[in-house]
């Protein structure tokens, strides 16, 4: 008897739980037929003058039935003496707001793009995103490069939430962009403006889905309800790390709606993307002889291999209506363990997550905390003492968890984000949110 057959006949009572009354086979491929469709990317008309510090907008044209991905293109010129650059296309896109029928649906910020990338993109996706939005660090002054910034609104992330323009006959969909007045290494060198810096050019491309007649009619005539995600951000708080003591701070969380996670970072408001004392560097802290000019260079690879000891947060906890939601945990727990348990990625130092959901990156809801039903929510923070000479990285890494480099006192902007669920209702040619703040 063949050896495989001996395994096959070795069948007992326990096997019933695995193979009794089988529901699938691995040896017959099953597929499903899909509705006929086509996708085309079409450039939009920009209203306003594109330039540093300006605001522009675009009204999504009615070229197709649904819209999904949106990519913003910038052409930037490396300016003057160069200066340190770090994701300049992100930095330039200071914020972008989505509006339907005059109602704000969502708003994203350049720091949120950086935080989202740090938390949710993995390996090749993160590297490819960097290629789209950052210099590769060897361009000469005067070099031009075309950058691509994909938007991350709810309908940009899955075709199942594609926005049905065909059902919004009476409401327009608009995007409002605010462009930053200063971009490191483009028109600003870290301390002053770069003379003669070239203005950016900008274009907006939208992916349209064209449906076949029967499905197009259904989308146009039937009402729709979409479970969407929104970003809540109430503005930067002022962080208060100290060079002489372990300072503490309580931050009121003014959020609403069922929320699946909180994400926060401490950043240097004059150096985009710097979330640690030494500006997020991967291998520059390997020895005591590293020059200061090297250790303050941002991590272009964004590999997340740098040490949490360079971050300013010592510990944190959340309180709901005066009750501890959980015991005080170290900052490294929110940077390492929480992302590991809920997302599975490697998060750069200085970016923190607390998830109420089992799988916060998934479209399927898997847990929330309803902040609309909480009167008083507080994020309690304790900072490290920022007292060690930043020019000696080995001294920083060789010390205790409660101290860090003196340059961590520059991390004075605290950005806290909440990602919540809401319902977008579309009927009678109009769309709007089911629940307001």
Swiss-Prot record:
GO terms for molecular function: lipid binding; structural molecule activity. Myristoylated at the C-terminus. Induction: Expressed in the late phase of the viral replicative cycle. Coiled coil: none annotated. Pfam families: Capsid_N (PF16903), Capsid_NCLDV (PF04451). InterPro entries: Capsid_N, MCP_C, MCP_C_sf, VP_dsDNA_II. It is found in: Virion. The keyword Glycoprotein applies. GO terms for cellular component: viral capsid. Keywords: Capsid protein, Glycoprotein, Late protein, Lipid-binding, Virion. The keyword Glycoprotein applies. It comes from the Viruses. Glycans are attached at residues 280, 302, 399, 406. The viral capsid possesses up to five major capsid protein variants. They behave as asymmetric capsid components. Belongs to the NCLDV major capsid protein family. Major capsid protein self-assembles to form an icosahedral capsid with a pseudo T=169 symmetry, about 190 nm in diameter, and consisting of 1680 major capsid proteins trimers. The capsid consists in 5040 copies of the major capsid protein (hexamers), 60 copies of the penton protein (pentamers) and 1800 minor capsid proteins of different types. The minor capsid proteins form a hexagonal network below the outer capsid shell, stabilizing the capsid by binding neighboring capsomers together. This is Major capsid protein. It comes from Paramecium bursaria Chlorella virus 1 (PBCV-1).
């Amino acid at each position: 008897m063949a050896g495989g057959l001996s395994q096959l006949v070795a069948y007992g009572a326990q096997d019933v739980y695995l193979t009794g009354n089988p529901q699938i086979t691995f040896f017959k491929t099953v597929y499903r037929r899909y509705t006929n469709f086509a996708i085309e990317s079409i450039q939009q008309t920009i209203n306003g003058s594109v330039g540093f510090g300006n605001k522009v907008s675009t009204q999504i044209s009615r070229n197709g039935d649904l819209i999904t991905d949106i990519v913003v293109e910038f052409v930037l010129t490396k300016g003057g003496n160069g200066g340190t650059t770090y994701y300049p296309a992100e930095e330039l896109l200071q914020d972008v707001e989505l509006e339907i029928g005059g109602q704000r649906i969502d708003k994203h910020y350049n720091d949120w793009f950086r935080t989202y990338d740090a938390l949710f993109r993995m390996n090749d996706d993160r590297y490819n995103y960097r290629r789209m939005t950052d210099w590769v660090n060897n361009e000469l002054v005067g070099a031009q490069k075309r950058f691509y910034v994909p938007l991350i609104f709810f309908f940009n992330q899955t075709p199942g939430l594609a926005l049905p323009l065909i059902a919004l006959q009476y409401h327009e969909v608009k995007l409002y962009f605010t462009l930053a007045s200063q971009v490191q290494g483009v028109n600003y060198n870290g301390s002053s403006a770069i003379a003669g810096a070239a203005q950016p050019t900008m274009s907006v491309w939208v992916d349209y889905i064209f449906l076949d007649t029967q499905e197009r009619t259904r989308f146009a005539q039937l009402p729709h309800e979409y479970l969407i995600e929104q970003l809540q951000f109430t503005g930067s708080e002022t962080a208060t790390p100290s060079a002489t003591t372990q300072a503490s701070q309580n931050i009121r969380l003014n959020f609403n709606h069922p929320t699946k996670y909180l994400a926060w970072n401490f950043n240097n408001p004059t150096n985009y993307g710097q979330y640690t004392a030494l500006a997020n560097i991967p291998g520059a802290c390997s020895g005591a002889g590293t020059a200061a000019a090297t250790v303050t260079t941002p991590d272009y690879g964004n590999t997340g291999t740098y040490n949490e000891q360079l971050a300013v947060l010592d510990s944190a906890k959340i309180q709901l209506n005066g009750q501890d939601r959980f015991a005080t945990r170290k900052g490294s727990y929110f940077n390492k363990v929480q992302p590991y348990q809920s997302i599975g990625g490697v998060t750069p130092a200085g970016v923190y997550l607390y998830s109420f959901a089992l799988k916060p990156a998934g479209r399927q809801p898997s847990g929330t905390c309803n902040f609309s039903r909480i009167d008083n929510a507080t994020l309690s923070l304790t900072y490290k003492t920022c007292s060690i000479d930043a020019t000696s990285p080995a001294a920083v890494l060789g010390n205790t968890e409660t101290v860090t480099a003196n340059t961590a006192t520059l991390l004075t902007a605290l950005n806290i984000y909440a990602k919540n669920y809401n319902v977008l209702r579309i009927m009678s040619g109009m769309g709007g949110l089911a629940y307001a703040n």
